């Protein structure tokens, strides 16, 4: 029996090595035949044989983990095909390719299933001693918030100095221009209620007023850089305070101090955190609020709350709704489940939920119209069908009737629709959306859309996957931090500029760009891996009978859903709230698991 298991493990090791090292192409398999590559394959196969021989039959298989392993395997195989070919041809292209793909899936599945079961075993059984901290760190015990705040500030200082006054992205530049009364592309995308009102709800109004208002302060005193630095100070205080509070809270619930200090190190030293803390973009404050929201959700699910705590929580919910236009979805997809999973909190949470929904409706349907502020365009919600139509027009435009082309033209403009199609970005397609489209014209468009869905569903599937696969496939990458000066404000006549520390900026930028390639730690800058970790956390909560705490993951999953229907593939700032919350969430859930196992 033992010999039989060893043979099985050897075969699985060979198959998994094939999965990791061989590439499928339209012409067959691709593998380097150099001595180095052959040696690599041999070493990997031997390592995996030893690994499987030790762990493959050690654990009683959990169905949840098998399902997750299957999902991860499918994501690897299909993600590769869409990343390389833009369709599923490297999965279903021919009989031989199908066989190669199935073998790859088997190899991935065995590896993921074994590794996940091993990880669960380590998490459940491994004990980490909470040793006494060195004297220099004894201050952490006495003042965890202040200690963490100061450490993070010190680590962020090089970024604050190098990127004074602040890094600005494209949206932030336009938000500032709105406040300064300068025409922006947002005005072209919406039906204006008053042509003299330049502010729109394309970006959250509260953030537009914050960044634009502080910029205007600088403008009025003759130094726009100072105004932007005021904004960076506000944002830095918010971000660092939330990070420090998360460390304080982890210490409060008695998480192992070694692990807490590791998380402090991550928030202080991983470059994406200081880079975004110094980047004026709406997602940063929102991401900090989401981290705080996840912590408070756990606190509510775990401990009895006072009236004051519920009031503060309601204020937090309101800020989430106001600081991101899609923040409402995070609340709607998480708070009701908290009520379902813990009946003791149903009344106060229901009151908070109804109150904030009412505020949201009143804000969007009453306050903004009364101020003649135009709401965002419906086109922002229609990236998926618009991309599907554009892909159909690009590859099968000759199949679309003249009558249907006229219907599409009323909504999207048909003549150059196929040329505007980009598989991983819908901006060029949706930016030509006719803002005066009537409900009847939109209805006719969707009738045409549905007609061609039935005719070629594969085209629609390809269009959708091309626009989202990067959120689930770890082997693809894109930019993830802002490092350059945005020229939109200088072009508008404002003296926004960086200082002369080009060398320091080059060093920090190089560190930021290199970080994703650091083993293990770099995964936090990989969108696909971040999503995988959340899926894995979900599985571990189910397996270890901690379903009540699934609610802590719902904010992240709601944001991932928004990414799926969003305009861009592998867009890091869209997933930023999930990244901000992840380190603290891992320790909160780990601590809850260890506490339960020790009872």
Give the positions of each predicted feature.
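Transmembrane signal-anchor helices characteristic of membrane glycosylation enzymes that use polyprenol
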Residues: 12-23, 69-82, 142-168, 355-368
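Membrane-proximal lumenal/periplasmic loop motifs of glycosylation machinery
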Residues: 162-169, 180-238, 279
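Membrane-interface alpha helices of multi-pass inner-membrane proteins
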Residues: 310-324, 335-336, 353-360
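Start-transfer (signal-anchor) and selected internal transmembrane alpha helices
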Residues: 1-15, 37-72, 97-158, 592-599
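Membrane-proximal stem/loop segments at transmembrane-domain junctions that anchor or position
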Residues: 371-499
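Short acidic/glycine- and proline-prone juxtamembrane loop motifs at membrane-interface regions
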Residues: 170, 275-285
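Membrane-interface anchor segments at the N-terminal boundary of transmembrane helices
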Residues: 27-42, 226-230, 466-553
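Transmembrane-helix motifs of polytopic, lipid-linked glycan transferases
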Residues: 110, 114, 230-254
């Amino acid at each position: 029996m033992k010999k039989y298991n060893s043979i099985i493990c050897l075969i699985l090791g060979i198959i998994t090595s094939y999965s990791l090292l061989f590439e499928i192409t339209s012409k067959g398999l691709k593998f380097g035949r150099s001595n180095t590559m052959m040696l690599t394959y041999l070493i990997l196969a031997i390592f995996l044989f030893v690994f499987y021989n030790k762990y493959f039959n050690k654990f009683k298989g959990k169905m949840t983990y098998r399902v997750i392993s299957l999902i991860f395997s499918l994501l690897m195989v299909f993600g590769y095909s869409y990343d390389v070919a833009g369709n599923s041809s490297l999965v279903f292209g021919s009989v031989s390719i199908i066989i190669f793909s199935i073998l790859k899936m088997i190899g991935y599945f065995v590896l993921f299933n074994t590794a996940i079961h091993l990880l669960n075993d380590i998490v459940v059984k491994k004990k980490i001693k909470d040793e006494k901290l060195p004297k220099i760190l004894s201050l952490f015990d006495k003042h965890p918030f202040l200690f963490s705040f100061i450490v993070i500030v010190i680590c962020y200082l090089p970024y604050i100095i190098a990127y004074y006054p602040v890094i600005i992205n494209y949206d932030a530049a336009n938000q500032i221009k709105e406040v300064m009364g300068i025409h922006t592309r947002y005005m072209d995308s919406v039906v204006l209620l008053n042509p003299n009102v330049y502010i729109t709800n394309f970006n959250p109004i509260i953030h537009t007023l914050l960044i634009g208002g502080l910029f205007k302060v600088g403008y009025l005193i003759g130094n726009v850089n100072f105004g932007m630095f005021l904004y960076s100070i506000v944002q830095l205080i918010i971000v660092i305070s939330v990070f420090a509070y998360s460390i304080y809270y982890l210490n409060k619930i008695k998480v192992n101090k070694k692990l807490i200090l590791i998380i402090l190190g991550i928030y202080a030293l991983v470059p994406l955190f200081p880079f975004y803390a110094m980047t004026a973009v709406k997602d940063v404050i929102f991401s900090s609020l989401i981290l705080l929201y996840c912590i408070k959700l756990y606190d509510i699910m775990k401990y009895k709350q006072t009236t004051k705590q519920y009031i503060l929580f309601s204020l937090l919910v309101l800020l989430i709704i106001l600081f991101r236009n899609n923040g409402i979805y995070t609340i709607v997809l998480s708070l009701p489940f908290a009520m379902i999973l813990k009946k003791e909190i149903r009344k106060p949470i229901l009151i908070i939920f109804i109150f904030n929904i009412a505020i949201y409706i009143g804000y969007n349907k009453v306050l903004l119209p009364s101020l003649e502020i135009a709401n965002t365009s419906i086109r922002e919600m229609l990236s998926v069908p618009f991309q599907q139509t554009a892909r159909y027009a690009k590859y099968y435009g000759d199949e679309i009737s003249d009558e249907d082309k006229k219907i599409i033209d009323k909504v999207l403009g048909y003549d150059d629709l196929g040329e505007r199609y980009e598989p991983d970005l819908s901006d060029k397609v949706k930016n030509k959306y006719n803002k005066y489209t009537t409900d009847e014209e939109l209805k006719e468009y969707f009738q045409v859309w549905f007609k061609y869905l039935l005719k070629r569903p594969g085209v629609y599937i390809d269009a959708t996957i091309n626009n989202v696969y990067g959120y689930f496939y770890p082997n693809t990458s894109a930019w993830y931090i802002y490092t350059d000066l945005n020229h939109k404000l200088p072009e508008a006549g404002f003296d926004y500029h960086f200082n002369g520390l080009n060398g320091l900026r080059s060093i920090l930028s190089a560190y930021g760009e290199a970080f994703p390639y650091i083993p293990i730690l770099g995964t936090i800058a990989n969108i696909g891996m971040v999503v995988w970790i959340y899926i894995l956390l979900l599985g571990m909560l189910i397996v270890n009978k901690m379903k009540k705490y699934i609610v802590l993951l719902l904010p992240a999953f709601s944001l991932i859903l928004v990414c799926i229907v969003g305009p861009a593939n592998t867009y890091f700032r869209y997933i930023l709230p999930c990244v901000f919350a992840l380190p603290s969430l891992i320790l909160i859930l780990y601590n809850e698991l260890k506490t339960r196992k020790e009872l």
